[in-house]
Amino acid sequence: MKKIIAMLMLILSTLSFAAKKLYVGTNAEFKPYEYLENNKMVGFDIEFMELLAKKLGYEVKWQNMSFDGLLPALQMKKIDAVIAGMSATPEREKAVSFSVPYIFFESGHDVIVNSKSTFKTKNDLKGKTIGVQLGTIQEQFAKENGSNPRLYNSFTEAFLDLQNQKIDGVIIASTSATEYLKTMKGIKKIDTIKDKSPKAAIAFRKADTKLAKEFSDAILELKTSDEYAKLIKKYFPEHYNDFIASIKKK
């Protein structure tokens, strides 16, 4: 009898562990948030999500897909959550729920052009063609600037066209623009658009309120931790001092 009980407890324990798997969608083309390095997904979002999952007792199963396919995949229950440097905009909140923001510093969006161009500010790009990634908030910024957005599956594709002068500019989050400016020739930054949109958060299905709260509580606990500070310093060194100063004020 004791052996039977022990076996049942082992089975229940195994099932419980399996139930703690969390399928998380991302788009590994958005350095330094998430990107591929030696065929392995790395980045701030990847490490931070693993940190949250460990704290809450989940095993993350990563699913890499196109940015515009993330929320549909979440709604169709192909994944349980999305972390991809995604802003919790009012439009997106109509379809899904979000955690509290997990990025706690101010950012913006850089306007990048070909180095040979004579454009000086974002205003010079009114009526011009601006490359943005499909499904991102940069499309709205381009429209608000009076530019014509051209949609790409990735920002890398947009920058390749910019290098070849097939488009007039690219609008991208400043934190990611830094990486492209370091590694790609023939492009330059001319302006920055102040970001008034909500900061990056983790997306969940509307029905998963308990899961969203669980992660929100963990985010708020971790934001003052040494682990979080180390991740900021590693992936966003230009924001580290401002981040530390903001924490000390609280």
Kindly label every feature range from the protein language model.
Residues K61-L74, L134-G135, R150-N164, K196:
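Short helix-initiation/N-cap motifs at beta->coil->alpha
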Residues P72, G85-A95, F141, D168-K196:
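A ligand-binding cleft/hinge motif common to bilobed small-molecule-binding domains
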Residues I137-R150, K189-D191, I219-K250:
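Ligand-binding clefts/hinges and TM-proximal coupling segments of bilobed small-molecule sensing domains
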Residues Y58-E59, M76-A84, K128, Q163-S176, ...:
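Alpha-to-beta junction loops
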Residues A28, F105-V113, T178-L220, E238-K250:
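Periplasmic-binding protein-like
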Residues Y58, S87-A88, V100-N145:
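A conserved helix-loop-strand patch within extracytoplasmic ligand-binding domains
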Residues A19-M86:
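Extracytoplasmic small-molecule ligand-binding "clamshell" domains
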Residues I46-K55, K116-F119, N123-D124, T129, ...:
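Extended ligand-binding regions for polar small-molecule ligands
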